[in-house]
Amino acid sequence: MEKRKVTIRHFLEAKGSRKLAMVTAYDYPTARLVDEAGVDGILVGDSLGMVVLGYENTLRVTLRDMVAHVAAVARARPRALVVADMPFMTYETGPRDALRAAAKLVRAGAEAVKPEGGVEIVDVVEKLTKTGVPVMGHIGLNPQRVLTLGGFRMVGKDEEARRKVLEDAKALQEAGAFALVVEFVPASLAKEVTEAVKIPTICIGAGPHCDGQILVLHDIIGLSEKPPSFAKRYADVASIIREAVAKYVAEVREGKFPTPEHYRP
């Protein structure tokens, strides 16, 4: 029997009872594979700028980029919930611009969107959720603010920063977010956030106390050149690709490929 489609309700009901597993995907074949592996959610992340397009950060990723990759993932018709990152400067300018951007992502196949920020984007989250667009929040480290942060640094190490993260979490919940990504904060703070809100929290680099975890696919399978310290590599796909292509190159140069079973006389 076919498994049921994962929905927002699935995420909400998992709070405190079942760990949620999410991963990124950016195209049709990887979306199909990670879905077959049983993930609860697929994030079409603006991290594609770094792991697919070769940028130093996520800031150069455009809405057009995101729409194309969301559409590719959606064509796999995954059981998992498809969440799309809202790229830099598509929502910071206000609710109206955010709604236009979210509409394009939803039309492409996204089932929820994820802007970064806390109290400062409450008006955006309220507008989106009241208009029928599910929102997953993102607190702690916001990669789109890498320039002002001076790099990808842990957030919430001092008391003032901890209070800000907690304030952001509660504000986003009140604004209508159905879940929160909590990125690169101390595990004790992630635990405090998880206990303070009624919606599920999804950790990345924030310890084991959230309601779920998310990692970038390329970090998991060994395709990232410089994975973050909090990522775990479960396979070395890079070596498999290099070995397979090297064998192909050698056989072509030695005249061993193609053989009769690969062509018609």
From Swiss-Prot:
EC assignment: 2.1.2.11
Binding, Mg(2+): D46, D85, E116
Self-association and partners: Homodecamer; pentamer of dimers.
Signal peptide: none
Keywords: Coenzyme A biosynthesis, Cytoplasm, Magnesium, Metal-binding, Transferase
Reactions accelerated catalytically: 3-methyl-2-oxobutanoate + (6R)-5,10-methylene-5,6,7,8-tetrahydrofolate + H2O = 2-dehydropantoate + (6S)-5,6,7,8-tetrahydrofolate
Pathway assigned to this chain's UniProt record: Cofactor biosynthesis; coenzyme A biosynthesis
UniProt protein name: 3-methyl-2-oxobutanoate hydroxymethyltransferase
Compartmental location: Cytoplasm
GO biological process assignments: coenzyme A biosynthetic process; pantothenate biosynthetic process
Taxonomy, superkingdom: Archaea
This protein's record includes keyword Plastid: no
Similarity section: Belongs to the PanB family.
UniProt cofactor(s): Mg(2+)
Binding note for cofactor: Binds 1 Mg(2+) ion per subunit.
Keyword Magnesium: yes
Pfam family, one: Pantoate_transf
Residue numbers annotated as active site: E183 (proton acceptor)
InterPro entries linked: Pantoate_hydroxy_MeTrfase, Pyrv/PenolPyrv_kinase-like_dom, Pyrv_kinase-like_dom_sf
Molecular-function GO terms, alphabetical: 3-methyl-2-oxobutanoate hydroxymethyltransferase activity; magnesium ion binding
